[in-house]
Swiss-Prot record:
Keywords: Cell wall biogenesis/degradation, Coiled coil, Glycosyltransferase, Golgi apparatus, Membrane, Transferase, Transmembrane, Transmembrane helix. It is a multi-pass membrane protein. This is Probable mixed-linked glucan synthase 6. It comes from the Eukaryota. GO terms for cellular component: Golgi membrane; plasma membrane. One of its GO terms (biological process) is plant-type primary cell wall biogenesis.
Length: 952
């Protein structure tokens, strides 16, 4: 039996595919079946029926926060007359909603807080501060923005949805007894741009995990896009293809999890529940040795290539000053980027390259050889076929805008169309590997369900390894993935976040959905006039939204429209007739069949090179109406947005064990630049023609709100910086945001803060995250707002006003510290950047402000401790949120907390002592009579102020 998969993003650590109790989990974190041996694999088919029935009870829920949606009201419901318990009539995934005991209070509290906040703002408007009108006006604007941004963030969370794939039903419908499958084809795109900054071993592990995934071999094709065009990347992939002939059969024989070799061999224990434990131990020892040799070859490739090239250049009589070519192992010159770059062989100037490392496998199973002297591993009962693997380095020429990752993805889309043309595409970053071998099947469940023909893409959450245990900079970001994205699944679906996303190919070609229903699974009738049939696609009865698919006609009979079989003029797709001919075949293939695999011949490869040419996209729709959208550094968000405004939906797929795992930048500088890139891209979308304010009426109203929030959140920096500095400075100036609070002020403030905390508790509950993660998320939000968000606003304003392009460096995945001594050494390596200036200033201002307040109380200028305490508490609230930032720029691991506290205390004491002992700072008032009440003058003419402050 295959490893069980369940939704919930880690909430169900021990559940089956439908949330039912699964077998006891191994200490490695995977279900027992993930470590089962050949005996378990061999018996899976014979016991499939019992396993399927046991794993797939509709409505079976094992989580206290979720309950199954009433299928009679869902767009995933079986047609009338279906038998509830019949396996063939069960959907391939089930939908859950939050229990009313959590959802109803959650919605009510949002309404209550909105009213309380409105009354609070009204009170603030009515009670002006005549002594500092600029302060009053600015604070009102800030409070209004905070309330507005909170509402933008909260409204899309009114209807969270959880979907759980049923892999048992999927296997029953699509897998056959002879080992073949009728699952649709799947092209997997992996992108890399620099084999130095993005370690080539990580890329190789990503490729190996894809080749070993549990998906029909003849339906799975892997494409690697190398934007550097370097021979190092190609030869590393060639080595990976060789090692895959051993690694992939080993994974299949013993049902290994995870199937990235680096992660697998790093497991502290390797429990095995099969019958052939001794054989497994011997096989594992052999494979481990081969993997160590493989890593040694990968790490030595750069030296080997340079040495080989020097030898060939010397043999060719290349003189000093002449271009020195980089040579392949077969004695031919590399057509891409050379080690010593020269004309036509630079990173931005080289020919296009398409090389097939592993060709299309046959449809029939191919068993491996038995154990022998030359082959110590017995693969006689294992299918040893490997998926197709293709290396692509698109052509680059000076004067052609290559559009970074978006351009690479579009080039891969065209190249894959002429080579494999699978109806579905999965994209992964090179530092992400498949952690759960069932991930591809789990994602495809959401593409093959009833009414799933309107689903454009399935987004998986991003999970990371190598993050420090305290997650100092909120790299996991589960509040966003398991909270926001899961909530959006109750509307039109989650946004596209750049990696771990499964696409329907035709959505990238500009096709529109066959139907439009913006209501979502729990509100199928929401949208009224917006829910309608756009056009009828062949193969589907359009009599009702829940119609079941009927036998589809051949792809060649796709309905002909204004532009033939294409949704827009042929010239919009480029000059390749071969590519244009693939579009109708991919436009609506039967979900129950896949195109026959065809060997990639020389003509097909030549065509793939042609469609990846640097000038191919000129005067076409690529980057605007077709493919990944250009014009922003966050091409992912705007690409998903363009699909949503056409009426397409998306789905969120969170399974356990996690589908994909990547590497996160744990260094503060790299993390800030990563957030700067994201926030800059969001603002670029806001100031472009893709502004969600002007999207089509096919966008769900609350989905539009979510996109507005995504494209405007960096503006928070302008108001947050004001609120994190002015209150502290008020201790020095004596002018405060609120001078005379009343009882109603405190009542409104208490309700606003209290409801916020309760809402956070409820959200933490249904999202399955911890309170600690919620706090960490808030802390890094403060750091990012004071640094990266502000920089993003300044950069985009500069771009809009002065028409200057924005460029970013590639986020480095290489550690700066000594990982052997400390795996988190990179966390505390200080790399100075201008993004750190603002948070440092805010920290100093709040420490100094608190010290001045303390000094004024000791000096007798202020006599009301309680009033001072409120402001000092807010200052320390700011410092608490910036503590991870301070910890990152001071000291070493384990010593940092002491260093930070000592510096804070030192600055505080020095400021207080200076204020008390330097007369000209505070004037002569401290030697006069006792301080009078607020608003009056002392005997020496110094005006006194009581302290009060409004929480933002």
């Amino acid at each position: 039996m295959a490893p069980a998969v369940a939704g919930g993003g880690g909430r169900r650590n021990n559940e089956g595919v439908n949330g039912n109790a699964a077998a006891p989990a191994c200490v490695c974190g995977f279900p027992v079946c993930a470590c089962a041996g050949a005996a378990a694999v061999a018996s899976a088919a014979s016991s499939a029926d019992m396993d399927i029935v046991a794993a797939g009870q509709i409505g079976a829920v094992n989580d206290e926060s979720w309950v199954a949606v009433d299928l009679s009201d869902s767009d995933d419901a079986p047609a009338a007359g279906d038998v509830q318990g019949a396996l063939d009539d069960r959907p391939v995934f089930r939908t859950e909603k939050i229990k009313g005991v959590l959802l109803h209070p959650y919605r009510v509290l949002i309404f209550v807080r909105l009213i309380a906040f409105t009354l609070f703002v009204i009170w603030r408007i009515e009670h002006k501060n005549p002594d500092a009108m600029w302060l009053w006006v600015t604070s009102i604007a800030g409070e209004f923005w905070f309330g507005f941004s909170w509402l933008l963030d909260q409204l899309p969370k009114l209807n969270p949805i959880n979907r759980v794939p049923d892999l048992a039903v999927l296997r029953r419908r699509f897998d056959h007894a002879d080992g073949t499958s009728s699952l649709p084809g799947l092209d997997i795109f992996v992108t890399t741009a620099d084999p130095i900054k993005e370690p080539i071993l990580s890329t190789a592990n990503s490729i190996l995990s894809i080749l070993a995934a549990d998906y029909p071999v003849d339906r799975n094709t892997c494409y690697l896009s190398d934007d550097s065009g370097m021979l190092l990347t190609y030869e590393a992939m060639a080595e990976a293809a060789k090692f895959a002939t051993l690694w992939v059969p080993f994974c299949r024989k013993h049902a290994i999890e995870p199937r990235g070799p680096e992660s697998y061999f790093e497991l502290k224990s390797h429990p095995y529940m099969g019958r052939a434990q001794e054989e497994f131990v011997n096989d594992r020892r052999r494979v481990r040795k081969e993997y160590d040799d493989f890593k040694a070859r990968i790490n030595g490739l750069e030296h080997d290539i340079k040495q080989r090239s020097d030898s060939y250049n010397a043999a060719a009589g290349v003189k000093d000053g002449e271009p020195r070519a980089t040579w392949m192992a077969d004695g031919s010159q590399w057509e891409g980027t050379w080690i010593e770059q020269s004309e036509n062989h630079r990173k931005g100037d080289h020919a296009g390259i398409v090389l097939v490392l592993l060709n299309h496998p046959s449809h029939a199973r191919q068993l491996g050889p038995p154990a022998s002297a030359d082959n110590p591993l017995d693969f006689s009962g294992v299918d040893v076929r490997l998926p197709m693997l293709v290396y692509v380095a698109r052509e680059k020429r000076p004067g052609c805008n290559h559009q970074k990752k978006a351009g690479a993805m579009n080039a891969l889309t065209r190249a894959s169309a002429v080579l494999s043309n699978s109806p579905f595409i999965l994209n992964l970053d090179c530092d992400h590997y498949i952690n759960n071998s069932q991930a591809l099947r789990a994602g495809i469940c959401f593409m093959l369900g009833r009414d799933s023909d309107t689903v454009a893409f399935v987004q998986f959450p991003q999970r990371f390894e190598g993050v420090d245990p305290t997650d100092l900079y909120a790299n996991h970001n589960r509040i966003f993935f398991d909270g926001t994205l899961r909530a959006l699944d109750g509307l039109q679906g989650p946004i596209y976040v750049g990696t771990g996303c499964l696409f329907r190919r035709i959505t990238l070609y500009g096709f529109e959905p066959p139907r439009i229903n913006v209501g979502g699974p729990c509100f199928p009738r929401l949208g009224g006039m917006f829910a309608k049939n756009r056009y009828q696609k062949p193969g589907f009865e359009m009599t009702k939204p829940g119609a079941k698919p009927v036998a589809p006609p051949p792809a060649a009979t796709v309905a002909k429209g204004k532009h033939g079989f294409l949704p827009m003029p042929k010239k919009a797709y480029g000059k390749s007739d071969a590519f244009a001919d693939t579009i109708p075949r991919a436009s609506h293939p039967s979900p129950y069949a896949a195109e026959a695999a065809v060997a990639a011949d020389e003509a097909a490869i030549a065509e793939a090179v042609m469609v990846t040419a640097a000038a191919y996209e000129k005067k076409t729709g690529w980057g605007s109406d077709i493919g990944w959208v250009y014009g922003t550094v966050t091409e992912d968000v705007v690409t998903g947005y363009r699909m949503h405004i056409k009426g397409w939906r998306s789905r969120y797929c969170s399974i356990y064990p996690h589908a994909f795992i990547g590497t996160a930048p744990i260094n503060l500088t790299e993390r800030l630049f990563q957030v700067l890139r994201w926030s800059t891209g969001s603002l670029e979308i806001f100031f472009s023609r893709n502004n969600p304010l002007f999207g089509s009426t096919f966008l769900h109203p609350l989905q539009r709100v979510a996109y507005i929030n995504i494209t405007t959140y960096p503006f928070t920096a302008l108001f947050l910086i004001f609120y994190t500095t002015v209150p502290a400075l008020s201790f020095v100036t004596g002018h405060f945001i609120v001078q005379r609070p009343t009882t109603m002020f405190y009542v409104y403030l208490a309700i606003v803060l209290g409801t916020l905390l309760i809402l956070a508790v409820l959200e933490v509950k249904w999202a399955g995250v911890t309170v600690f993660e919620w706090f960490r998320n808030g802390q890094f939000w403060m750091t990012a707002s004071c640094s990266a968000y502000l920089a993003a606003v300044l950069q985009v304003v500069t771009k809009v006003v002065f028409r200057r392009d924005i460029s970013f460096k590639l986020t480095s995945k290489l550690p700066a510290g000594d990982e052997k001594k400390d795996p988190y050494a990179d966390l505390y390596v200080v790399r100075w950047t201008w993004l750190m200036i603002t948070p440092i200033i805010i920290i100093l201002v709040n420490i100094i402000g608190s010290a001045v307040a303390f000094a004024k109380v000791l000096d007798g200028e202020w006599t009301h401790w309680l009033k001072v305490a409120g402001g000092v508490f807010f200052n320390f609230w700011v410092l608490f949120h910036l503590y991870p930032f301070a910890k990152g720029i001071l000291g070493k691991h384990g010593k940092t907390p002491v260093v930070v506290l000592v510096w804070w205390a030192f600055t505080f004491v020095i400021t207080a002592v200076l204020y008390i002992n330097i007369p000209h700072i505070h004037g002569p008032g401290r030697h006069g009579a006792a301080s009078p009440s607020h608003g009056h003058h002392s005997a020496h003419g110094t005006k006194k102020y009581d302290f009060t402050y409004a929480w933002p």
